[in-house]
A protein has these predicted regions:
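Single conserved hydrophobic/aromatic residue that forms the stacking wall/gate
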Residues: 1-12
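Short glycine- and Lys/Arg-enriched binding-loop motifs that mark or flank ligand-binding interfaces
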Residues: 3, 19-21, 52
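Flexible, charged surface loops at secondary-structure boundaries
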Residues: 13-15, 71-72
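Active-site groove signature of glycoside hydrolases
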Residues: 15-26
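Conserved AdoMet/S-adenosylmethionine-binding subsite of the radical SAM
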Residues: 24-152
Length: 152
């Protein structure tokens, strides 16, 4: 959604409590557009909370540290942890970057420093032992883990 369209839609719906940047594709792939939109919403609707749902690979996508920059406009971040190891992550996510899992964990640690709220998320379809391992990964970093229910 472009800033102009978003602005007109938001004027109609002032009752929104939260706007989430997410969807099919990674929002930080269009970092400048996302930040411009977030800045606009922040200026026009300061009471609306802004959240980013991300794969956590923004630093790699944009070739620079991004958590602090994003946190200037976004209140909270939810990072798709997906699974409990680099090998399983590569199998499930098929990232284009080497060491993507480690990069995602680094982004999460940076995000925790800058955002009001940082969380990891997984879907409840992975094995119970992997869920427990994901919980440990989150706990070791002091980051909340959200376990989402799978829905068709």
């Amino acid at each position: 959604i472009g800033v102009g369209l978003l602005g007109s839609e938001m004027c109609i719906r002032d009752s929104y409590k939260e706007l989430v940047f997410c969807g099919y594709g990674e929002p930080t792939s269009a970092l400048d557009n996302m930040l411009e939109t977030a800045k606009y919403v922040r200026e026009k609707h300061p009471d609306i909370k802004l959240r980013l749902n991300t794969n956590g690979l923004s630093d790699r996508i944009n070739n620079k540290p991004t958590a602090e920059l994003i946190s200037k406009y976004i209140d909270s971040v939810s990072i798709s942890l997906n699974t409990c190891s680099s090998e399983k992550y590569d199998e499930v996510c098929r990232p284009v970057f080497d060491h993507a899992y480690e990069s995602m964990l680094k982004f999460a640690e940076d995000a925790k420093k800058y955002f009001e709220h940082t969380q990891f998320s997984i879907v409840d379809t992975i094995p119970e032992e992997d869920i427990k391992a994901c919980q440990k990964i989150a706990d070791d970093r002091g980051i909340h883990l959200k376990i989402r229910k799978y829905s068709d």
